[in-house]
């Protein structure tokens, strides 16, 4: 039977080792990032969610607007790859399977890019972007989140929080899990 102090020593040592090995550096900003989860796993999950969105959401039948979105996206893809090549860095989008959809919803003024390059634009944002340049700015912003691997960071932080909560629960003899929620 392991005592609590020994548990904390082992857990703390393992946690520190894991955190140090999971630290990486963002290629452009040189900001430190925590990446505990494999990107391929997150990309796979995102692709499944994206396919579900495509099946359950009303997609726009405006082929001209969708084509414009795809052309802008293609130019951004090329720009990202060219930039990383120009600074001799590995292209973080090399394994992306880019795909674009236009969701028919004029009330939602948004766009998003999932890990792996799955991009959705809501028709509602088009009245705000006004033209190709405005749309490119919005799409570039969303794609930048995927390029910077923000989803991997968020998922890693959530994992740390869950593991930390479980460890505290073990250390406190179940005080967290036995707390009644109102």
Regions found by a protein language model. Name each.
Residues 1-182:
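A Zn2+-metalloprotease active-site environment signal
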